Design a protein with these regions (language model features):
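Conserved alpha/beta enzyme-core scaffold
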Residues: 1-217
Length: 217
């Protein structure tokens, strides 16, 4: 499935898996924030659905409240993150212990200081060595992985790359494939993500769905 419609990807995931979703996303900046926010909104509105997110380093720009700090920091933030950077709704709610009861967040790395006041994040923290993350995803019965990908137009057709987040995704893919266990990978094209070749390059058939829209930022 290839589409430019965000909502159709959300519908595709729930239609393919069901109402109870266990989802993984890369650590750091490999997350498709817009898709994750759309999934969050869907589950928040549908109390008979559940969403468990397994990831690490859910990053957001720092927030400032004082006028002097804002005047200093805002231009820097806009240069580094852009003026319309989509904040991860699940992590903003988790930090304040305001997650809906049908949504859980499990992280194995925290951004420094972000979980100090969150009982939910601390209680659902997973102490996992990076070497064992792929195995932990498999043992946790994760059903779908979502991540940003890069795209390159060539005379021979479109090429895709996992870019700076190939390692765990490829390991997880191999584990599920060897076990003949159902698993979905959703790629979201980001126009500014660097296209890395070698093992990071994959075919379109690596993904069950590809979202390619100019609205991704």
């Amino acid at each position: 499935m290839q589409t430019s419609d965000l909502n159709s990807v959300v519908e595709f995931i729930f239609k393919s898996i069901g109402k109870n979703i266990k989802l993984a996303a890369p650590l750091g900046l490999g997350k498709p924030n817009d898709l994750l926010n759309a999934l969050y909104d869907h589950v928040e509105k549908n109390q008979d659905h559940t969403l468990s997110i397994f990831t690490a380093l859910s990053l957001s720009p720092p927030t400032v409240t004082e006028d002097l700090a804002a005047r200093f920091f805002t231009p820097f933030k806009n240069r580094q993150w852009g003026e319309s950077y989509p904040i991860l709704k699940y992590y903003k709610a988790a930090q304040k212990d305001q997650l809906p009861q049908n949504i859980r967040v499990h992280e194995f790395y925290f951004q420094a200081g972000t979980a100090l006041n969150s009982k939910h994040l601390q209680r659902n923290y997973q102490s996992v060595n990076y070497t064992h993350v792929a195995e932990n995803i498999y043992n946790s019965d994760i059903q779908v992985l979502v991540q940003l990908i890069a795209k390159k137009e060539t005379p021979n057709g479109v090429r895709y790359s996992l870019s700076c987040n190939p390692d765990l995704t490829l390991d997880v893919y191999d584990i599920y494939k060897r076990a003949h266990k159902k698993f979905m990978i959703i790629g979201v094209v980001h126009p500014e993500l660097p296209f890395l070749e070698g093992d990071a390059e994959v075919g379109s058939d690596f993904f069950q769905a590809i979202l390619d829209t100019s609205e991704t930022n």
